[in-house]
Amino acid sequence: MAPAMEEIRQAQRAEGPAAVLAIGTSTPPNALYQADYPDYYFRITKSEHLTELKEKFKRMCDKSMIKKRYMYLTEEILKENPNICAFMAPSLDARQDIVVTEVPKLAKEAAARAIKEWGHPKSRITHLIFCTTSGIDMPGADYQLTRLLGLRPSVNRFMLYQQGCFAGGTVLRLAKDLAENNAGARVLVVCSEITAVTFRGPSESHLDSLVGQALFGDGAAAIIVGSDPDSATERPLFQLVSASQTILPESEGAIDGHLREIGLTFHLLKDVPGLISKNIQKCLLDAFKPLGVHDWNSIFWIAHPGGPAILDQVEIKLGLKAEKLAASRNVLAEYGNMSSACVLFILDEMRRRSAEAGQATTGEGLEWGVLFGFGPGLTVETIVLRSVPIAGAE
């Protein structure tokens, strides 16, 4: 019996490593420019009398390195829901009504773009991983997206709620395991984030909440992951070489979020950038030891841009050249911090800028790369990537 069982297990598994086969992104149409945002935010929350706090918020926005963000919440929606604009008003029902509907809708746009780039019928999707920080409901956003896209009822679904900013790495780790352990699997991975649950008015006694109001934006990203790609019809973008998760030492309470009647509250300690930069070298050494890589300027970088201070301190700690974090900084500038969706936007940015610059590979001409997710815990996801040659590149 044992040999037959081994043969069955072998047949169930893919032969090669998982790869990203397509990427799609989407944002709400409502763009908010960071230079104008303090005036807008204090006006819409009826907080213009807090002049000193407004000046602090302006400085936060100026230092954020963000040019614009996209938000589902328009001025009209906020005027219709004044409790969302308060700091401590019961408003969870109104917030839930928005995100339960809009998170899957935004996800559908990104997923449709990824499926179109992939070029295969959606009936070939075997698994769906859906991640969002907001809008817990039953049946969940994974079910709603299955219905919106018209996926097969037998698609195997996984739903991740309220993981936070590290979860763009989590979904890649799960997708890798699914693709490599199920021959022929094609995994649709979607992160969809809408700030309607975290938006709230300012408070002089809670400046950490104000930091979140200066950074977060809305966006959805989708990827298709599979092993053993069809060389005639599928074009891999990146291979997923390894994936790991760790909780950083002495970091408990550094980033917290709590779902309450007033919405999803956000708490942030000042030393988050320091905690990440202090521990990132060990994460890299553990991940790249099997490859014999220890020059962090010889790899391409996709780092979750929680804020500019995190990127700055990582850059200094590791002695990275300025261009190493350019893709991460550009996504932060153009979209803000979109929580779990951010690293997938950066993955898209990386392959596009590599092609436009005539680079030899999808990873800025380099072979190996790293994707980092940072978030509550402090939790770090470390994904080792391998780029692929760009067709027609010199």
Curated annotation (Swiss-Prot):
Keyword annotations of the record: Acyltransferase, Flavonoid biosynthesis, Transferase
Q: Which top-rank group of organisms is this from?
A: Eukaryota
Which EC numbers characterise this protein's activity in its record? 2.3.1.74
Provide the GO MF annotations for this entry: naringenin-chalcone synthase activity
InterPro entries according to UniProt: Chalcone/stilbene_synt_C, Chalcone/stilbene_synt_N, Chalcone/stilbene_synthase_AS, Polyketide_synthase_type-III, Thiolase-like
| Function description | The primary product of this enzyme is 4,2',4',6'-tetrahydroxychalcone (also termed naringenin-chalcone or chalcone) which can under specific conditions spontaneously isomerize into naringenin.
Name the chain's protein: Chalcone synthase 8
